[in-house]
Swiss-Prot record:
PANTHER family: DEHYDROGENASES, SHORT CHAIN, ESTRADIOL 17-BETA-DEHYDROGENASE 8-RELATED
Family indicated by similarity: Belongs to the short-chain dehydrogenases/reductases (SDR) family.
Pathway: Cofactor degradation; B6 vitamer degradation; 4-pyridoxate from pyridoxal: step 1/2
Catalytic activity: pyridoxal + NAD(+) = 4-pyridoxolactone + NADH + H(+)
EC code: 1.1.1.107
Ribosomal protein listed as a keyword: no
Name listed for the protein in its UniProt record: Pyridoxal 4-dehydrogenase
Chain's role: Involved in the degradation of pyridoxine or pyridoxamine (free, phosphate-unbound, forms of vitamin B6). Oxidizes pyridoxal to 4-pyridoxolactone, but does not have activity toward pyridoxal 5'-phosphate, pyridoxine, pyridoxamine, pyridoxamine 5'-phosphate, 4-phthalaldehyde, 2-nitrobenzaldehyde, pyridine, formaldehyde, 2-carboxybenzaldehyde or sugars.
Complex formation: Homotetramer.
Temperature impact on function: Optimum temperature is 50 degrees Celsius. 37% and 33% of maximum activity is seen at 30 and 55 degrees Celsius respectively. Stable for 10 minutes at 45 degrees Celsius or lower, 76% of activity remains following 10 minutes incubation at 50 degrees Celsius and 1.3% of activity remains following 10 minutes incubation at 60 degrees Celsius.
pH dependence remark: Optimum pH is 9.2. Retains 66% of maximum activity at pH 8.6 and 57% of maximum activity at pH 10.0.
GO biological process, alphabetically ordered: vitamin B6 catabolic process
Length: 248
């Protein structure tokens, strides 16, 4: 594996476990200095320690503007600013439509969509202030295309992330900052393993062109590509990484 991201600094949110941790590990293997951020401070520290000397842990709550401001101030002091932003942090609820109330809706939108905006606002401002070309890669979900049941607020938020990514590409292209989204399908992450709805995942596999459960590393590989110079002419796109569940 070549260090194609040597000299770059990447921030990965929600990186204490699962897909986020795999992305952080892959970007570090590619040579980047990686900021492992998570609301779970101890989890972030453990993940950074497992990745090695290229990783630094900084706890943050992406839905709290003050916490995000402090996060980027610390990144600026440590590294001089980011080149790559991976918006991975989110919460994944399974709630039947009849049980979706306004508090639930606001909580999911605040973290999964507004939190993505808060971090992206701060991250791209930091890139622009340094005059850096940059990468913004947001982890959305193929549930947006599938209209997955029992996840109405989550589906809406992730659809918003896809729309936001397209608009962001238009706004930031003139600064050589690209914006793309990745939509995972069924991934054997910590959340999936712990889900009380595990029995439903067999049906998801039936819809896939390729059988089996994806691994967090499958998403990390795609993010690695989008973060690299190989993807310098790709922006405003959404890449489905779901074994062909969504085909269009």
């Amino acid at each position: 594996m070549t260090e194609r991201l040597a000299g770059k600094t990447a921030l990965v949110t929600g990186a204490a476990q699962g897909i986020g941790k795999a992305i952080a590990a892959r970007l570090a293997a590619d040579g980047a200095t990686v900021i492992v951020s998570d609301i779970n401070a101890e989890g972030a520290k453990a993940a950074a320690a497992s990745i090695g000397k290229k990783a630094r842990a900084i706890a943050a709550d992406i839905s709290d503007p003050g916490s995000v401001k402090a996060l980027f101030a610390e990144i600026q002091a440590l590294t001089g600013g980011i080149d790559i932003l991976v918006n991975n942090a989110s919460i994944v609820p399974f709630v039947a439509w009849d049980d979706v109330d306004l508090d639930h809706w606001r909580k999911i939108i605040d973290v999964n969509l507004t939190g993505t905006f808060i971090v992206t606002r701060a991250g791209t401002d930091q890139m622009r202030a340094a005059g850096k070309a940059g990468r913004v890669i947001s982890i959305a979900s193929n549930t947006f295309f599938a209209g997955t049941p029992n996840m109405a607020a989550y589906v809406a938020a992730k659809g918003g992330v896809i729309g936001f990514t397209r608009a962001l590409a238009t706004e930031l292209g003139k600064y050589n900052i690209t914006a793309n989204a990745v939509t995972p399908g069924l991934i054997e992450s910590d959340g999936v393993k712990a889900s009380p709805h595990n029995e439903a995942f067999g049906f998801v596999e039936m819809l896939q062109a390729m059988k089996g459960k994806g691994q967090p590393e499958h998403i990390a590989d795609v993010v690695s590509f989008l973060a690299s110079d190989d993807a310098r002419w790709i922006t405003g796109q959404t890449l489905n990484v779901d074994a062909g569940m969504v085909r269009h």
